[in-house]
Swiss-Prot record:
GO terms for biological process: translation. InterPro entries: Ribosomal_bL17 (IPR000456), Ribosomal_bL17_CS (IPR047859), Ribosomal_bL17_sf (IPR036373). PROSITE patterns: RIBOSOMAL_L17. GO terms for cellular component: cytosolic large ribosomal subunit. Keywords: Ribonucleoprotein, Ribosomal protein. This is Large ribosomal subunit protein bL17. NCBIfam families: L17. Part of the 50S ribosomal subunit. Contacts protein L32.
């Protein structure tokens, strides 16, 4: 029985799902906004929010945890240098998921995933 099983399978093996979510989290933290399907976006939010919470407390242990989860040094540097200090006053809810229409090929529902306190576009 699937009672209380929390994560979506997204029709992938566990290793593929973990790699996909890691790559999407790296893209979101790098670009601060991405477009993906709605179920992937909702699952991505569960990956990124704890990472930003780690970035708010700059310790060596937290840096190592963040690197273990992202496997990307540039993302870790941005997380602790830019994103962590930006969200110090906010207690969670760092990621916004907005519905974004439907994909042309298969009519899959799309979502725009973005960080809440994005700097103004130039």
């Amino acid at each position: 029985m699937r009672h209380r099983n929390g994560n979506r399978k997204l029709n992938r093996t566990s290793s593929h799902r973990a790699a996909m979510l890691r790559n999407m989290a790296n893209s979101l933290l790098t670009h601060e906004a991405i477009v993906t399907t709605l179920p992937k976006a909702k699952e991505l939010r569960r990956v990124v929010e704890p990472l930003i919470t780690l970035g708010k407390k700059p310790s060596l242990a937290n840096r190592r945890l963040a690197f273990d989860r992202t496997r990307d040094r540039d993302v870790v540097v941005k997380l602790f240098g830019d994103l962590g200090p930006r969200f110090t006053a906010r207690n969670g809810g760092y990621v916004r998921v907005l519905k974004y229409g439907f994909r042309k090929g298969d009519n899959a529902p799309l979502a725009l995933v973005e960080l809440v306190d994005k700097p103004a576009a130039e």
